[in-house]
Design a protein with these regions (language model features):
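Catalytic core of pol beta-like nucleotidyltransferases
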Residues: 2-85, 93-176
Length: 176
């Protein structure tokens, strides 16, 4: 098992400094579960790219479906240390009324919160703000119920356009 010395205590201290709906006891219990997981850095890194691949498929589908030239897609890759998750947050620069029919046409039900991807099931949902944001999240089973609690985030990229997400996925597939 890969050990992260002191990470539980450090992550818990960070997590408890953030306003959240999760109680301190739940934070510690969940972090203890993560300590027992066999998740070394390579597993977490692979999960990050799995989320990127899942998001790339959705970005490409939206790019084809939203034909208006003023609609832009950007994404931020996020890696969460506390829940060992990886996610990409897709921001669609269009109104929610335009995005919903496209998602329904792609057979993606925003209310189901789950979509099947090449890398397995991913939790996904729409954040109904303006502009709407679609988050495609790849989370291990023990952490799935905590996926919407973004407590201790390891890092966030600057906004990436579709071409940059595509380039990163291709680079990873080639093993570089």
């Amino acid at each position: 098992m890969y050990r992260r010395p002191g990470s539980t205590l450090r992550a818990a201290k960070q997590a408890l400094q953030v306003n959240t709906s999760i109680s301190p006891a739940e934070v510690f219990r969940h972090l203890e579960i993560l300590e027992r997981q066999n998740d070394g850095p390579l597993v977490v890194q692979q999960r990050y790219f799995d989320a990127c691949e899942a998001a790339l498929g959705l970005m490409e589908a939206l790019d084809e479906a939203l034909l208006r030239p003023d609609v832009r897609l950007t994404g931020r890759l996020v890696q969460g240390h506390w829940n060992q998750s990886a996610e990409i947050r897709l921001r669609v620069h269009a109104s929610a009324e335009e995005v919903r029919p496209v998602l329904e046409h792609l057979a993606f039900d925003p209310r189901s919160e789950t979509m099947s991807t090449r890398v397995g099931p991913c939790t996904a949902w729409i954040d109904d703000q303006s502009p709407p944001m679609i988050r495609v999240i790849s989370v291990p089973s023990p952490a799935r119920k905590f996926a919407n609690e973004s407590l201790v985030v390891g890092g966030t990229t600057v906004p990436l356009d579709l071409d940059e997400v595509r380039r990163r996925c291709l680079k990873h597939r080639r093993g570089s």
